[in-house]
Amino acid sequence: MASNGAYPVLGPGVTVNPGTSLSVFTALPFATPSPGPTHRPPLVTAVVPPAGPLVLSAFPSTPLVAGQDGRGPSGAGASNVFVQMRTEVGPVKPPQAQTLILTQAPLVWQAPGTLCGGVMCPPPLLLAAAPGVPVTSAQVVGGTQACEGGWSHGLPLPPPPPAAQVAPIVSPGNAGPWPQGAHGEGSLAPSQAKARPDDSCKPKSVYENFRLWQHYKPLARRHLPQSPDTEALSCFLIPVLRSLARRKPTMTLEEGLWRAMREWQHTSNFDRMIFYEMAAKFLEFEAEEEMQIQKSQWMKGPQSLPPPAPPRLEPRGPPAPEVVKQPVYLPSKDGPKAPTACLPPPRPQRPAETKAHLPPPRPPRPAETKVPEEIPPEVVQEYVDIMEELLGSHPGDTGEPEGQREKGKVEQPQEEDGMTSDPGLLSYIDKLCSQEDFVTKVEAVIHPRFLEELLSPDPQMDFLALSQELEQEEGLTLAQLVEKRLLSLKEKGCGRAAPRHGTARLDSSPSEFAAGQEAAREVPDPQQRVSVETSPPQTAAQDPQGQGRVRTGMARSEDPAVLLGCQDSPRLKAVRPTSPPQDHRPTCPGLGTKDALGLPGESPVKESHGLAKGSSEETELPGMVYVVGSHHRLRPWRLSQSPVPSSGLLSPGGRGPQGALQSPSAQKRGLSPSPSPASKSKKRPLFGSPSPAEKTPHPGPGLRVSGEQSLAWGLGGPSQSQKRKGDPLASRRKKKRHCSQ
C-alpha cells in the first residue's frame, strides 16, 4: 500500500507527470519460477495523474523476472501486478482496482473497461530506460518533469500538443545496439518497431526539451544565482539528470543536482558551447511564445476576463516546422559521456549553499570572449618613443640661452638651440662670467640690436642674423666697432630727423631753411648718445686737460653753422625730446624754457644770477666759446635758422657742461638766462627725465616769432648795455683769448 508522506523516489522507466490531482500507486515485485535465485526489486512509489494513461517500461537495473544472467528467461510469460490507486486531493473515495500487466514485451497500463490489447498513449514527457546500455556518466535523475512536478512542490504543467504524446516502450529483453539518438532521447528499439504498429512513436521533439529547459531554469538559478550560465546549465541538466536516474534510481534530487553541478564545473568550454547554442535557441522560442501570448490577449480585448490560469499557447503554424527540424544537441552520440575530472574548471566554483533568489541574469552570449583585449606591446613602445621625442624637444626651448642672455653673454650659433652638453664648456663660461673684467668688456662690445630685441616684447628674435653680424665684428677692434655703430646710428638719425624738419612751423625764408638743413646734416642724431656712453672710456685720454666729458666719445664739431644752429633754437628745445649732439662737450645752450630766456618784464635778479653762474663755471670752457661769440656777433641771430634737432641734451636750468655753456652764450646774444630753483641744488643725469617745461611744450605764438622780432629782441635787450660797458664781460673775453692762444 502507498503511504501519503512517503518521499518520492523515482525508478527507471516510470512515467511521472504531476498535475493538480495526483494519485499514489505502489508497484509490488513478483517472482516467477526460475532456476536461478530470485532478486526482489525495491518498493517503487510514484506520483501519477488519474486522468492520463500510465505506461510503465521494464526495470532495466533490477528486472522483475530475473534469470541467471539478470534478465530472466526469454520465454517467460506475462505476470500481473495489482496496484491500489487512490486520490489525494478531494474527498476520499474507495480505491479503484486497476491491473498492471508486466511482460517481457512492451508493458501496457490497462484501466478497467479497456481492451487488453489496446495501447494507450503515454504522457508527453516519458523516459524509457534502455537495457543493455552501460550507464557510466551522471545523467538525469528520474523522469523528465519529475523534479519540477514531484520534487518542486507541484508546479503546473500545460497540456502537451498531440504530436508529442507518444513515448517509446522498451522491453528489458532488448540488448541490441541503439540507433542514432540513443540515451533514451526518443529512438526506438528494433524489437519495438517489429512488435506493433501502434507501439511505434515519433521521436521526442525539441519542444519537449524546451519545456524541460523551462522547468529546470529555477533549479539552475538557485545554484548559480548571479551567473550568466543559468540557461546553459538548464540545458545541461536535461541529459545529466536522466542518466543519473538510470544509474541510481534511489538518488534524491539534492544529490542529483550536486553531482550535476560538479559535472558542469569539470566540463570544458568546448563541450559547453553545445548547451550555450541550445539555450540561445530556447530563449528565442520563449520570446516568440511570449509574443504569441500577448497577441492572443490583445485579440481577446478587455471585454472578456482572462481565465485564472491561462494555459501557455504553443507555437503553431509556421514556427512549428522550424521547431521540429531543429536537432537536439547532446554531448555525444555513441553513448553517455564519462566525467572528465582531469580538466581544470574554467571559472572558480561558486558554493552550492547560495540559494538566494535574485533577478534572472541577462541571456548568455557564447560568442563573446570575457577576457579583456590587451594593447600590443609594439604599439605601447611606439607610443612611448613618440612621447619621449616630444618631451625631449621642449627643455631646449627654455634652457640655457635665457640665463645667458640675462648675464649679457653672446652665444655661438651652435648653442642657439640650448642643447649645449659639454660640461667643460659650461664650466669655462661660468668661470668667465664670474670675472668682472670679462663682463665689463662684454658689455662694452655688446650689440645694440641684441639689446633692442632682448628688451622688446616680441618673443621671436632673429638669432641667425645677429650671429652673422657678431661673426663679422669679431675681427674688428674696439675703435672700429665704435665707429661702425656711430655710423649706423647716424644713418638712423638722419632718417628720423627728416620728418622733424617738416614739422617745424617757422616763419623763415626758403634760403634760410635750406641753410638750416645743411647745418642739420652735420649734426648727429640724438640717439647716438646711447651707444656712445656704452663705449669704454678710452676717449678720456684724448682730453688730457679734463675739460671734455668722458661720456661723450665723438669728435668735436668745428662748423660754426652747427653751433649757431644749435644756439638759434631756444624755443624748439621745449618741443624736441631730450638728446644731446654728439661732441666731447655740448655746444648747444641749455635754453628751452621761458625761465632761461631774458624776456622783457622779468626781474633783474634772474639776470644777475645768470651772470654769476656763468662766471663761476667759466674755467671749464675751452676756447670754442670765443669762436661762438665772434660768429654770433658777425651774423644776426634769427629764430628761423633753427630746424636742427639740437634740444634735449640738457634740462632747462641744468648744471655741469650745460650750465657752463648756458650763461656765456646767452650773454653773447644779449640774453640773461636764469635757471630754475630746482636746478641749483643738484645736477641732472644725462638720461634723466625732462623737466615739466619740456614735457609740456608750448606750440603757441612763441614758435612763430619772425626774424625781425627776434633780431630786435636780441640786439635791443637790456644786456646790450652791459656789453657796451664791458664791465664784467670784457675782462672775461680777454682771459679766454689768452687761454685759447
From Swiss-Prot:
Bias regions of kind Basic and acidic residues — which residues? Answer: 402-412
Where does the record place Basic residues bias? 731-741
Which InterPro entries does its entry note? NUT, NUT_N
Q: Which domain of life is it from?
A: Eukaryota
- Chain spans, region Disordered: 172-200, 293-375, 391-424, 496-624, 638-741
Composition-biased stretches, type Polar residues, lie in 528-545
Q: What Pfam families has UniProt attached to this entry?
A: NUT
Question: Low complexity bias located where?
Answer: 639-650
The residue ranges flagged as biased composition, category Pro residues, are 304-321
PANTHER family assigned to the protein according to its UniProt record, in alphabetical order:
NUT FAMILY MEMBER 1, NUT FAMILY MEMBER 2F-RELATED
The family assignment reads: Belongs to the NUT family.
Name of this protein: NUT family member 2G
